[in-house]
């Protein structure tokens, strides 16, 4: 067994004493609260505010469970993968390549990871694939806008998935293609709530 010098022993002992003191104060009694999510900025913040304006009306009409959606970018990875396909190609309509399909397959990993914690709702901003295998096409469907009529259509698209009414969180991504900004969003809620 390796011998410790006095300084190493005292350092180790001091660390152990500090841990015991924390335990005695109840530091290990409960889970630590997660850090507050980063406040949205720029276009993300504007988009979430515009969506929440429409969402609140749906809440008042009894069509959704929560009065507003909280920005939670945990699902952004999945929608960002989709958005980057368009950004990299610099076209809002894309015939999917083998490489694109591999990227889209990565979304399944995000989905599996997210579904451990969240139930997933609807999404808006990207079309369902059309065409035959080898020539499947997807497109960005909503140019970025915070105008009420556009946001209403965007939220209606999210709401096409019936369980979206339970949503409490939203992830957004605003890809820029050929100088135009588009918007993509997905909603979800905590399974443990």
Feature roles, as predicted:
Residues 3-4, 42, 55, 193:
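Short N-terminal secondary-structure initiator segments
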Residues 23-24:
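C-terminal motif of bacterial Sec signal peptides marking the signal peptidase cleavage site
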Residues 14, 30-31:
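Polyanion-binding and phosphate-handling cores
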Residues 1-20:
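N-terminal secretory signal peptides and thylakoid transit peptides that target proteins
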Residues 16, 82, 86, 158-161:
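Alpha-helix boundary/capping residues
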């Amino acid at each position: 067994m390796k011998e410790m010098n006095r300084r190493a022993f005292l350092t180790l002992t001091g660390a152990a004493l500090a841990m015991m003191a924390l335990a005695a104060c109840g530091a290990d009694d409960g889970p630590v609260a997660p850090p507050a999510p980063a406040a949205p900025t720029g276009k993300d913040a504007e988009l979430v505010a515009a969506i929440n304006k429409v969402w609140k009306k749906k809440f008042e009409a009894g069509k959704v469970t929560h009065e507003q959606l909280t920005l939670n970018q945990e699902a952004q990875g999945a929608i960002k993968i989709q958005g980057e396909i368009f950004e990299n190609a610099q076209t809002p309509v894309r015939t999917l390549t083998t490489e694109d399909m591999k990227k889209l397959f990565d979304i399944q990993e995000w989905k599996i990871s997210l579904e451990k914690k969240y139930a997933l709702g609807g999404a808006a901003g990207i079309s369902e694939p059309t065409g035959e295998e080898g020539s499947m096409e997807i497109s960005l469907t909503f140019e970025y806008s915070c105008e009420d009529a556009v946001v209403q259509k965007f939220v209606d698209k999210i709401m096409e998935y019936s369980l979206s009414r339970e949503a409490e969180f939203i992830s957004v991504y605003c890809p820029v293609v050929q100088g135009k900004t588009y918007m993509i969003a997905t909603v979800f809620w905590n399974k443990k709530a």
